[in-house]
C-alpha cells in the first residue's frame, strides 16, 4: 500500500497530525526498509472497564496494525497511581497499587476484542519508571519549566483562579513523555485533551537524541447525551463488557446526528459507504432507525459475536413492538439546558398536554411513559440534554430533542 493510501486511512477521524509531512516521510522509509513503525498509545487503568470512548484510539491502533506496523498498548500502571490532571480543576485522588493492577488485568482482557494479539505488544510503564532513582526523576524534571507547564490550559486556569496545583501533577506530562523515550515511539496517539503531553514526548525524545514522534490526536467521543465526553462518572457511557442487549438498546437511544459521528469513529464502514448511507437517509430511502440498528449490530457483534447481535436486535424489536412505539412521531426541538427539566413541563412543550399542571396529573394517574418506562413521580426531572420519547396514553407520542 502506497504512502498516500496509508495516509488516507490514518487521517480518517483524526483531529490533527503533527507533523503530517514528517509522518509521510516515516511511512516512506518504513516501506523502503521493511521496518514497521512503532505506534504507541497509553491508557491509565483508573477504572476496571473500557467504554466506547476508549475504543476510538484502539480502532486507530488496529488500522496501523492492518497497515503492517507495530502497536504498543501501554498500560500506565505507574502513572495511574499519580492520576492524570488533564482537564481537571482539582487534584485527582491517587489510586492504590492494588487498584491499578486489578484494573490493568481487565484492560488486557478487553483490548484484544479490537486489537490483534499477535501484533500487539502490551507494556507497563512501571517497567522503567519504577526503576528511576530520585536523581533520575530530578534530571527528568529539569527538562521543563513551570512557565512551560502553565501553558497547559487546565494548569493555566487553575493558577489564574488561585486553585492548588501539586508538584507531582507537573511531573505527569514529563513522565508520560518519557514513556515515548523508553519505547522509542515513532508515532503516539491520544485524545485532543492529551496534545500537550504528546508534544512533551517529542521534546524529550530530542533531548535523548531520538527522532521525535509524530503525534496524532483523535476526537473525544461524546457520550449518550451527545454533549459531554463519554465518561463513566457522568453515566453517559457504553461499556464494551456490558450485556449485548444493553449495548444495543443504548445505541438505539442516541440522536441521529450522534449516530453519524459514531459511524465515523467506531464503524468499519468506509467513508464512501458512510457518505452513501447519509445520502440514503437524506433521500428517505433509509430510515434513521434502520441505520441505528445496523450500527448497533456491528458494535454488539464486535464485542459479543454475531449470534448475540442478532438476539439483541430481536429482543429490541420485540420490546419496541410490545410498547407499540411508532417510528414516526412529532418532534419537539428544545435548547439544551444545564441542570434538569420537569417532565410535566416537557409534556406541555411537546403538545401532549395543555399545561404543566395537566402533565403532572397525567403522570400521577399512570398515563405517561418515558422511553417506554412508566413514570409515576410528578416531580420527576430529566437532564436537559439528549433525546426522550414521551408517551401519553396509548396512542400519543412525541420525541423531545435537546440541541
UniProtKB/Swiss-Prot annotation:
What top-level class of enzyme does the UniProt entry assign? ligase
Q: Which GO terms describe its biological process?
A: tyrosyl-tRNA aminoacylation
Cite a single GO MF annotation. ATP binding
Q: Where is this motif: 'KMSKS' region?
A: 229-233
Query: What is this enzyme's catalytic activity, as reactions?
Result: tRNA(Tyr) + L-tyrosine + ATP = L-tyrosyl-tRNA(Tyr) + AMP + diphosphate + H(+)
Ranges of residues in domain S4 RNA-binding: 341-402
Protein residues bound to ATP? 232
Name the major location: cytoplasm
What's a single GO CC term here? cytosol
CDD domains according to UniProt: S4, TyrRS_core
Q: Which UniProt keywords apply?
A: Aminoacyl-tRNA synthetase, ATP-binding, Cytoplasm, Ligase, Nucleotide-binding, Protein biosynthesis, RNA-binding
On the tree of life, the source organism's domain of life is: Bacteria
Family stated for the protein in its record: Belongs to the class-I aminoacyl-tRNA synthetase family. TyrS type 2 subfamily.
What is known about what this protein does? Catalyzes the attachment of tyrosine to tRNA(Tyr) in a two-step reaction: tyrosine is first activated by ATP to form Tyr-AMP and then transferred to the acceptor end of tRNA(Tyr).
Subunit details for this protein?
Homodimer.
From the Swiss-Prot or TrEMBL record, give the protein name: Tyrosine--tRNA ligase
Organism of this sequence: Geobacter metallireducens (strain ATCC 53774 / DSM 7210 / GS-15)
Its taxonomic placement starts with: Bacteria, Pseudomonadati, Thermodesulfobacteriota, Desulfuromonadia, Geobacterales
Q: Which gene encodes it?
A: tyrS
